[in-house]
Amino acid sequence: MEKDDNIQTVSENVFEDVEFAEEKPAVPKKKSLFRRIINNITIEPALFIIMFASGLDNIASEQIIIWKTCINDFNFTEEICDNLTNETYGEEQGMVADELTNFNFIKTLVTSIVPTLMAFYLGAWADMFGRKPIFYLFLGSYALEQAVVLVCAYYLESPKEWLLLSYIPKNLAGGFAAWTLSVNAFISDISAPEDRAFRFGMLGLITKLAGPPSSQVGKLLFRYGNNVSRQFAYVSVFATTLGGICIGALLLIWRIHRYTWSPPKKDRNQRNSFSLMVIVDTFKTVFKRRPGKARIYILVLVAIVVFSIMPLFGEFSISYSYTFVRYNWQVDENSDYSTITSIVDICAQAVFIPVMAALKLNEAYVMPILFCTISIRHAVKAFAVEPWMYYLASFIDCLGFYAFNIRQSMVSSLVDRDELGKVMAFTSAVDSVFPIGISKAYSEIFKVSKTKKKIFSTLSY
């Protein structure tokens, strides 16, 4: 695909006040690690607030489904629903857990199909109109989603299916595929090639930093709210989440406001924004011939992540049901698990990422090692008959998340800047579509294996 010399690419004019290292003929001066971190801070504080707010209701959102299922679907009494972890109600607990996994599969279905299709258009739009409109679209729809969840919490006796309505606005805006694409493309645009892995690592670390406090604050909000009423417990958590998302969104908009972008002149052959050929163009961009082995590297990176991310999504779809049935974990125990494992991840990454940057370790060698830790994690969890083994598995994988940051960095280095949106759209679409089938498979395996205690933990993972 030839580029018209008269048309500027997005990356050539997106950020007028940003200079890239490869454009400087002089040898850049070496910066201290601290200075390098300070100079690279842009949207990270806003992302921290948004991720902190998002983590507040992770456990409560699962617990409210359990409650609505228990009360509405099975018509159990409040006494039974409050004591499902009691051995006396083992059968009722299993019935509720099965329904939870079924609902989570429907949720995955609803939250994956539209974002998968939208990802292709978002990539093209990001290249045509810039990254900021995608940010605005996602953040607005995310706040609207949380508002609907808040209404469902206020009307606690309402059917759990009402919660599915909350996912519609964000899905139409592209879901988390839009968020991932806009963040990754934005960071790639404002970063020199040698800084991209470091910047992506910082983003991953920021995400992890938000985890421990958000889990504990969410647990405390739920606990103290429950002293007033069950309804107030859920409302307090979801209302705080909505407020945090709005504050983070405003900060993010303010931080990216100074980065200006002038749209390129429209090529007469350029696709209409909603043309089906946009999807075709995305596939052509990903699979087209490139110098050397660049195309092979791109496809290999996509394939590696597909086979790594599938079990992670499968695990996520059954994790709450798994710990609920096997260890009798609920809000407090799951919040503590999230906090402790996040702290370990933060400490490990806080040491590893700067050391990797200082030693200039080859990303191509580091990434396979990190993916191996992810595989070991699943193997250990497969035999986690005791809670401490479940913790151990997550500790082994404390650096695994950084492998995905390296993937993004390597992909962004293999394509032209004006193609970056389309390539990242393709990877976002792939990341969105595969959870559909894998979530269903894990749900069915969970329902079969939980009745056979000896193989329960092994088959579920």
Language model features with spans:
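A membrane-interface helix-boundary motif in multi-pass transporters
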Residues: F222-G243, E444-Y461
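Transmembrane alpha-helices of Major Facilitator/SLC transporters
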Residues: N334-L359, L370, I374, G437
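Hydrophobic core of transmembrane alpha-helices in multi-pass small-molecule transporters
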Residues: F48, E145, C152, L156-A178, ...
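Intracellular juxtamembrane helix-capping segments at the cytosolic ends
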Residues: A60-S61, F176-A192, Y402-D416
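Cytoplasmic helix-loop-helix junction between adjacent transmembrane helices
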Residues: S166-I206
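C-terminal ends and interior cores of transmembrane alpha-helices
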Residues: L137-P159, C372-V385
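Glycine-rich segments within core transmembrane alpha-helices of 12-TM secondary carriers
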Residues: D195-R223, I245, S428-K440
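Juxtamembrane intracellular "pre-TM" segments in multi-pass secondary transporters
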Residues: F15-N40, R258-A303, V325-R326
